[in-house]
């Protein structure tokens, strides 16, 4: 906490001095907790849900009302809508199936089996029979069966489950039996039901939309087909409705997503629930992608199908696949990877990787941590001293009940060299998926590498860590370890850097895995010629 009164008094006497000196009150974060190792974390929406919401708002702006159509559709409705074509259409539908409820009796043999488990049945026989009978009749849910058996016999639920497994094997041998109910394969099957019910409830014309999941039994899933997808569908009912409404709605809807210029091409499929010559494919031009794309289909429902539902006015239906539009908007190549990214490779950008490169060894004690900055400044200031040369830094630390006198010597004995090597000020950058050490100056850098390094410096993401920074933290961390182990001296020698570990850096395994899988590189090679000797008294 600041001593506010002292600061105000100091500022009243000499504002400039107070302004400069109080900067030390703002303590900098430790290096592994500083930017870019810390990064903002944002929630992330899913592109399909984003597209759904954008489509919802687009429909609402155009005056449509939102409805939820039935997901479960009786196969009889498919026959009513498709006529003779229904059999072929039903091949792509998923049928709902359920397990039958076996007629399980409580015979003498089963009573004997239960009693062999150490449970007396005689006084609970009637209660157990009622439970089994209730299950058969459907008055008892299957997920309550074990609990009710346990309660009836006054035993634990574990023992109740054992009885179900060992005494009533009929439950293990059940096979699902299909019903006549299907999961809707397209939104049309629901629109007939909805429009039919609204005919006597809403004045004509009316405009409806629904965005929801459909299910289609594809032979296989691939980059453009899934067995479950979202349909963004609308229906307009009114006496004067025709395919011109479909064209206008397609333009109004899709122009809100950046499409311009539209082509309406007769669809060769000719589904029987549409009036002949009305089923139309919509192609739209996307200026950013610079290509024509098929994005929607519309048509006017057949009077034959409408009449079976008591609908006596034309109904235009337009539908488009949400995933298709999301792929276009997000420039995705594979619908599976877009919808289920968790099952595919997670891509880290350079900013992500930069947050995953950290110092390996960092001192814990604040006094020793602060010593690191002094050591860094001393090395940087004198890096070009001509050898033979030596720098010394001395400090005294309180450690427990003792004092530690520390003498740090940085030296170069060989003549004709600098105190430190030319790569000592190299800085770690992320660029194009690579981790690279970039020099402060490009003087002396080979031309074949210069362009890459220059781009890395201007377009990449810096970690803010230089070789000398990381190495000095290695020295002070080793000093702290020596305090604990009561070591009196140690040396640090780093001639040539070949890997991150040579300069006291580590990278998260997730980032490392991506770098290796993408054939990217970690190239931090460079001469630093650091020689340090530390004595502790």
UniProtKB/Swiss-Prot annotation:
Any idea what this protein is called? O-phosphoserine--tRNA(Cys) ligase
Q: Which family is this sequence assigned to? A: Belongs to the class-II aminoacyl-tRNA synthetase family. O-phosphoseryl-tRNA(Cys) synthetase subfamily.
Pfam families tied to this protein: SepRS_C, tRNA-synt_2d
Enzyme class, UniProt record, top EC level: ligase
What superkingdom does the record give? Archaea
Enzyme Commission designation: 6.1.1.27
Catalytic activity field: tRNA(Cys) + O-phospho-L-serine + ATP = O-phospho-L-seryl-tRNA(Cys) + AMP + diphosphate
Q: Which InterPro entries match?
A: aa-tRNA-synth_II, aa-tRNA-synth_II/BPL/LPL, O-Pseryl-tRNA(Cys)_ligase, Phenylalanyl-tRNA_Synthase, SepRS_C
Q: Which SUPFAM superfamilies match?
A: Class II aaRS and biotin synthetases
Which residues take part in binding substrate? 186-188, 231-233, 273-274, 317
Report if keyword Nucleotide-binding is assigned: yes
User: Listed GO molecular functions?
Assistant: ATP binding; phosphoserine-tRNA(Cys) ligase activity; tRNA binding
Any one of the GO BP annotations:
translation
Q: What is the annotated role of this protein in its UniProt record?
A: Catalyzes the attachment of O-phosphoserine (Sep) to tRNA(Cys).
The alphabetical list of record keywords is: Aminoacyl-tRNA synthetase, ATP-binding, Ligase, Nucleotide-binding, Protein biosynthesis
Q: How does it assemble?
A: Homotetramer. Interacts with SepCysS.
């Amino acid at each position: 906490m600041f001593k506010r009164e002292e600061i105000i008094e100091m500022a009243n006497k000499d504002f400039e001095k107070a302004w400069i000196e109080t900067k030390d009150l703002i303590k900098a974060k430790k290096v592994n907790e500083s930017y870019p190792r810390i990064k903002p974390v944002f929630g992330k929406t899913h592109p399909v849900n984003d597209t759904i919401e954008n489509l919802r708002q687009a429909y609402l702006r155009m005056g449509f009302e939102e409805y939820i159509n039935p997901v479960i559709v009786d196969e009889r409705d498919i026959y009513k809508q498709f006529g003779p074509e229904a059999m072929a259409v039903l091949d792509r539908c998923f049928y709902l199936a359920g397990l039958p409820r076996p007629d399980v009796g409580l015979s003498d043999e089963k009573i004997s089996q239960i009693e062999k488990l150490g449970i007396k049945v005689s006084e609970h026989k009637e209660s157990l029979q009622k439970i089994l009978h209730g299950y058969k009749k459907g008055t008892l849910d299957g997920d309550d069966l074990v609990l009710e058996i346990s309660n009836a016999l006054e035993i634990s639920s574990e023992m109740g489950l054992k009885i179900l497994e060992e005494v009533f094997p009929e439950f293990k041998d059940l096979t699902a039996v299909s019903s006549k109910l299907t999961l809707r394969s397209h939104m049309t099957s629901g629109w007939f039901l909805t429009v039919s019910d609204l005919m006597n409830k809403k004045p004509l014309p009316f405009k409806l939309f629904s965005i929801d999941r459909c299910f289609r039994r594809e032979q296989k899933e691939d980059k453009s087909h899934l067995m479950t997808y979202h349909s963004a569908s609308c229906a307009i009912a009114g006496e004067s409705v025709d395919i011109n409404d479909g064209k206008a709605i397609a333009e109004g809807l899709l122009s809100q997503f950046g499409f311009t210029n539209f082509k309406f091409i007769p669809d060769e499929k000719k589904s029987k629930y549409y009036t002949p010559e009305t089923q139309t494919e919509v192609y739209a031009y996307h200026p950013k992608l610079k290509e024509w794309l098929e994005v929607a289909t519309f048509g006017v429902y057949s009077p034959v199908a409408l009449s079976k539902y008591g609908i006596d006015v034309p109904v235009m239906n337009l539908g488009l696949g949400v995933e298709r539009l999301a792929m276009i908007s997000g420039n995705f190549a594979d619908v599976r990877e877009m919808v289920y990214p968790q099952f595919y490779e997670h891509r880290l950008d350079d900013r992500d990787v930069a947050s995953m490169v950290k110092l390996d060894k960092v001192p814990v004690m604040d006094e020793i941590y602060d010593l690191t900055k002094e050591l860094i400044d001393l090395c940087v200031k004198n890096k070009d001293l001509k050898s033979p040369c030596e720098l010394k830094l001395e400090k005294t630390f309180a450690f427990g009940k003792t004092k530690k006198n520390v003498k740090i010597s940085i030296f170069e004995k060989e003549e004709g060299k600098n105190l430190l090597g030319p790569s000592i000020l190299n800085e770690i950058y992320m660029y194009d998926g690579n981790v690279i050490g970039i020099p402060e100056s490009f003087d002396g850098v080979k031309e074949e590498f210069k362009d890459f390094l220059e781009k890395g410096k201007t377009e990449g993401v810096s970690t803010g860590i230089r070789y000398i920074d990381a190495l000095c933290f290695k020295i002070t961390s080793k000093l702290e370890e020596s305090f604990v182990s009561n070591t009196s001296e140690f040396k640090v020698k780093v001639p040539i850097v070949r890997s991150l570990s040579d300069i006291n850096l580590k990278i998260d395994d997730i980032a490392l895995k991506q770098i290796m899988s993408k054939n990217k590189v970690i190239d931090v090679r460079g001469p630093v010629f650091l020689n340090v000797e530390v004595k502790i008294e």
